[in-house]
């Protein structure tokens, strides 16, 4: 086993020292670099951060959600996963049907105003509960549009019908493993305006060599403190699942980023993280009785010997 997160820590440090300060869509402000890359050898363990606790259950449920082709947060809420809540909640509070307290700019306001934060949390709790209990409401306001699950599994064709990119690429890996077309794309320009959040991890490509399966991800935009650690673990898990179905060994995960940024209200958290010492990476366990990607459930995926530091909380920029 080895310490796998050093490329991530090095990139955080580089952005803090060499990054460009910019304004951004959320109004928070960032420090960013353009065109960064991290490489993780999956033979050395599973690349989940140890310098802070990463809730692996959230990563599992989100990836399984994508792989189901699901775009409704109801499945996530059933697994106590609130990663995507804010995006669905935004659709609700901006609708004509919403009659509650003013939730304009709820992301920033909840950070600055304790009383508003309390009201916001109450409204969010009511929203989540209604998504879980009311099927009609869930279909209307729990759906995030054509996000990852839709593009991966149900890419709409102009002439009608859809393309299942995940099944297609698995079939290609089995039949023509040395193809240079082992690609899945989540970026559909026609759907970008109607998505709750246009895809950040835009495209990934598989590569087979010496019986090993590697994957390179291109991510157009990466929230380095909150989002990217999840993306690293999620795509490392995806490589392992696809390798299982295709009879290959996991090779390398290469993470290429366009705008790799740290939000200004995460600077203190980043400094705290960089002062911590990393532990050895854990190992990934997959149920040996499962082979097909579509058959895996939460209980079939576990981390062994995941030793980590404590959680570091930081606000989400919406």
From Swiss-Prot:
Organism: Lactobacillus johnsonii (strain CNCM I-12250 / La1 / NCC 533)
Domain of life: Bacteria
One Pfam family it belongs to: Thymidylat_synt
Entry EC number(s): 2.1.1.45
Residues annotated as binding (6R)-5,10-methylene-5,6,7,8-tetrahydrofolate: 223, 317
Cytoplasm is among the record's keywords: yes
PROSITE patterns the record matches: THYMIDYLATE_SYNTHASE
Any one GO MF annotation of this record: thymidylate synthase activity
Protein name, as recorded: Thymidylate synthase
